Amino acid sequence: MRFFIDTANVEDIKKAHKMGILDGVTTNPSLVAKEGVDFHTRLREICEIVGDVSVSAEVIALDAEGMIREGKELAQIAPNITVKVPMTPAGLEAVAALSKENITTNVTLIFNPNQALLAARAGATYVSPFLGRLDDIGQDGMGLVETIAQIFVIHDIPTQIIAASVRNPVHVTNAALAGADIATIPLNVIESLTQHPLTTQGIERFLADWEKAQQ
């Protein structure tokens, strides 16, 4: 399973990139709004940092014509831009049109298997089921990822699954087991993946033993 970072903060992206584990970036209007910067300018900054890995940038328009227009504009920013569109009939129309022009697409806000299947049929490069948001309303977010993965295997569908709305390390482990191709996660969760109390204790013990040996 590959790792994307879910943020528009360049410092967070730099930290993840330096770890050598970053396979892509996902952004959305809410994340960019938090940064208080020009959307296109920030996307260029991100692309410069991460090189040629996928950078998902979401359209704002709700109609198909507007999504297609915005998607083409976003794709001009850098060759590794993936156009992110919401799961709606208009979104499917936009995905179909953009895919015909070899523009990679990520259909977001997936909450059931049929949505993922339709997005894939329209030509989506990625689908993004939202785990945490389903868990918030008492539904099985991880079960959704597993079901989508099974359907894609049965029907030999090449669309990749991005586990989104990932809140904790357990989500990451379970997404990998469920068959997600990618997990997109914020920096705090990435950092928590590196941590375990016994790792910390082990480091402290090694250092203490080393200091004793030098006396």
Swiss-Prot record:
Record-stated family = Belongs to the transaldolase family. Type 3B subfamily.
Q: Where in the cell is it found?
A: Cytoplasm
| Family annotation (HAMAP family) | Transaldolase_3b
- Name the job this protein performs: Transaldolase is important for the balance of metabolites in the pentose-phosphate pathway.
Native source organism of the sequence: Exiguobacterium sibiricum (strain DSM 17290 / CCUG 55495 / CIP 109462 / JCM 13490 / 255-15)
Which residues participate directly in catalysis? 84 (schiff-base intermediate with substrate)
**Sorted alphabetically, which Gene3D superfamilies does this protein's record hold?**
Aldolase class I
Enzyme type, top EC level: transferase
Q: Name one GO molecular function term.
A: transaldolase activity
- What NCBIfam families does this protein's entry cite? fsa_talC_mipB
| GO process annotations (BP) | carbohydrate metabolic process; pentose-phosphate shunt
**One short Pfam family name for this protein?**
TAL_FSA
What's the protein name?
Probable transaldolase
SUPFAM superfamilies assigned? Aldolase
Reaction(s) catalyzed by this protein?
Answer: D-sedoheptulose 7-phosphate + D-glyceraldehyde 3-phosphate = D-erythrose 4-phosphate + beta-D-fructose 6-phosphate
Q: Which gene encodes it?
A: tal
